[in-house]
Each structure stands twice: as C-alpha cells, then as structure tokens.
Amino acid sequence: MTTKGILGKKVGMTQVFTESGELVPVTVVEVQPNVVLQVKTVENDGYEAIQLGVDDKREVLTNKPAQGHAAKAKTTPKRFIREIRNVELGDYTVGDEVKADIFAAGDAVDVTGITKGHGYQGNIHKDGQSRGPMAHGSRYHRRPGSMGAIINRVFKGKKLPGRMGNHQRTMQNLQIVRADVENNVLLIKGNVPGANKSFVTVKTSVKSK
C-alpha cells in the first residue's frame, strides 16, 4: 500500500457539525504547501522516500549545507523537515508542492507529533500511582513505594520520578472530517499529540479499517 503524507502545524481544537447533524470535536491542522526537497532512491540512498519541508526559515538562521539543500529545490530553507516512506516516487519530483488536496473527507490517517512537556514530575502525576494516607500519623504521602529488599539494583523501566512528556507519539487511525484546500486546513476528528503551534506529520493510516 502506497502512503501519502503532508507536514502541518497544529492550530487547536474546535467542533463542527457533520451533514447528518452530529457534533464532532476536531483538531485544526494548518497545512501550508509542502515542498519536495529530495527524492531518495534505493540506488543512491538504500531506500525509497521523499523529503518534505514546510515553514520558511530565514537564511541568516540557516547553515550553508541547509541553504544549498533547499536551493536544489529552488526554495527557501525550511523549519520542519521530515521523510515519508512507501510513496509512489514517480508522482514526485524535487521542487514539487504537496497540498491538502491529497486527502479527502473520510480518509484514515496517522498523526505524529511531540507531546507536551511537563518537566520533572513525581509518580502520582507521571504514572498515575496512588498516594498514601494523608492523616492519622502516616508519614508516607506521595513518595514511590518500596522496590523490595532482595534484588539490590533498579530494573530498567522502573517507574520513578523523572521528566514527563516531550516524547514523539503517533495517534493511529484518525478520520479526516474536512480537507479545506483554499484555506490550507485539515480538520481531523479527535485530538492529536502536541501543543498548539507545534509541527505534526499526517500520513495515510497503516491500520485503516
């Protein structure tokens, strides 16, 4: 199955009515025209993919290699660059624009983004653990529980206080409610990872029903 994909920026959430009168919560994703910066082939790169870029970046903030890479596509340096695999390479050439019209209402997509960062958090906030008694002489409230007395080491993956969020996550099998080509907007049913104004990747779902 060939994949279609586009890069965008999360605007926020709202709700719209469908033709049947159902009120649906949607995430608004702004998808300005993406530029194909590179077409990767098995002969040159060992795998097939296209490299897309979106959101112009000032040249003074860009190093020389990135400027030259963008110049090959006759465009300006881009702030957000990602690769899309399993595409039909014959449909793309360097410098082409990819717009919102590659998707239509009803399409199933996977959306990848960076989740909100919450900083250093304890077990109760980070992992949903239960707190201890807050009264009657208890001196155990919000601390991690005992790890046992025998093992003499901490297992990998042990749930302990630490940095929460700011991970790459993918929401699978979301439905596109509307694809507005004139305004460069996709309305996606439900929520997608990341804060408002963060970049996301929208691709054809790998588990579409």
Curated annotation (Swiss-Prot):
InterPro entries: Ribosomal_uL3, Ribosomal_uL3_bac/org-type, Transl_B-barrel_sf. One of its GO terms (cellular component) is cytosolic large ribosomal subunit. It holds the Pfam family Ribosomal_L3. One of its GO terms (biological process) is translation. Keywords: Ribonucleoprotein, Ribosomal protein, RNA-binding, rRNA-binding. GO terms for molecular function: rRNA binding; structural constituent of ribosome. Belongs to the universal ribosomal protein uL3 family. Part of the 50S ribosomal subunit. Forms a cluster with proteins L14 and L19. One of the primary rRNA binding proteins, it binds directly near the 3'-end of the 23S rRNA, where it nucleates assembly of the 50S subunit. HAMAP family: Ribosomal_uL3_B. This is Large ribosomal subunit protein uL3. It comes from Lactiplantibacillus plantarum (strain ATCC BAA-793 / NCIMB 8826 / WCFS1).
